[in-house]
Amino acid sequence: MQSQIVCHGCRNILLYPRGAPSVCCAVCHAVSSTAPSPGMDIAHLICGGCRTLLMYTRNATSVRCSCCDTVNLVRPVSSIAHLNCGQCQTVLMYPYGAPSVKCAICNFITNTGMNTMRHLPPNGTSYTAPSTSAPTTQSQNVTVVVENPMTVDAKGKLVSNVVVGVTTGGKK
């Protein structure tokens, strides 16, 4: 099984066998460590230009893709909001400012009014919706990711609209 890392010297993508402690770039001969430095919190995002998975440190504000040179803005935690689906009450996650969210479970479109929105806590912990139903003996959380149609922002660029829903699997 192989993994990928970006060369610290020339920014090329390097393939290496999983488990290797470091990899030497064939282009610039720089040695890159495959393990993140201690204390570094690593996050991932998908490049808006070429859809490549990018890895970056959490304190970054933007990430340049080494494949297509697109500069991807990193969305701060405070720009992600939650609301309950207007039909099945599944908790949905959406980018702050979106006018509506389509539920991946029941396909209901919920308007994102200020009275239904919940911000993600700033420490990065996940949101847990309070339960209004009787406790179940064995519930299993299911996470559903839906990519809604792309929209155009004020600068004329395409913007991805990704929705994440979490359900206990009780309602369909």
UniProtKB/Swiss-Prot annotation:
Alphabetical list of InterPro entries matching this protein:
LSD1-like (IPR040319), Znf_LSD1 (IPR005735)
Region Putative zinc finger 3: start and end of each range? 82-112
Q: Which UniProt keywords apply?
A: Nucleus
Its GO CC terms are:
nucleus
What residue spans carry the region label Putative zinc finger 2? 44-74
- In this chain, the stretch annotated as Putative zinc finger 1 covers 4-34
A Pfam family reported for this protein in Swiss-Prot or TrEMBL: zf-LSD1
Bilayer-spanning residue ranges:
none
* Subcellular location(s) per record: Nucleus
What role does this protein play? Answer: Putative zinc finger that may be involved in programmed cell death and defense response.
Protein name from the UniProt record: Protein LOL2
Gene encoding this chain?
A: LOL2
